[in-house]
């Protein structure tokens, strides 16, 4: 999962800055989609509150999801206008509207990530030792790796370090 920007970023940023962020997100999606068609067989999913995004970005994201829906490779999730609190509020609204009984199973079925396994490892770049509202429900048993490296400088070698660290962890899932 790549966190393109948060709901808080959406509320706090100036219009011109948001346009730049949207443009960068579109370029990244176009690049990933083009590379994917050639060799990776990735499946794309988008999480977040899409309703507030520009129409062309919404269309691009929906098209990318639709065209890769049957791919069998790794699932790549783009968190666009995503915030953990926002997701939890949207889940509660769906639950109330559905009338289904409140249960962990029904709650999880309403999450943006329904049908996708919870993350095993979350890597936080930029020297911040917090999740900033990233997947509060899904991250309960995730291992957290924090690095001072900024996202633009996060290299394949940095990823290898994080994965090597993860492999040393004895996971107990609350036991």
Question: Where do the PLM segments sit?
Answer:
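Flexible, compositionally biased loop and terminal segments
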Residues: 1-175
């Amino acid at each position: 999962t790549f966190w393109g920007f948060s709901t808080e970023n959406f509320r706090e940023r100036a219009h011109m800055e948001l346009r730049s962020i949207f443009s960068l997100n579109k370029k990244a999606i176009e690049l990933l989609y083009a590379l994917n068609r050639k060799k990776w067989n990735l499946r794309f999913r988008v999480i977040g509150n899409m309703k507030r995004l520009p129409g062309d970005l919404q269309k691009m994201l929906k098209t990318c999801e639709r065209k890769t829906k049957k791919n069998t490779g790794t699932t790549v999730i783009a968190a666009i206008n995503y915030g953990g609190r926002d997701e939890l509020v949207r889940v509660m609204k769906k639950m109330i509207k559905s009338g289904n009984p409140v249960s962990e199973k029904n709650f999880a079925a309403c999450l943006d990530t329904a049908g996708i396994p919870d993350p095993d490892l979350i890597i936080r770049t930029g020297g911040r030792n917090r999740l900033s509202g990233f997947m509060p429900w899904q991250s309960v048993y995730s291992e957290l790796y924090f690095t001072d490296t900024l996202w633009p400088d996060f290299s394949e070698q940095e990823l290898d370090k994080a994965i090597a660290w993860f492999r040393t962890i004895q996971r107990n899932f609350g036991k």
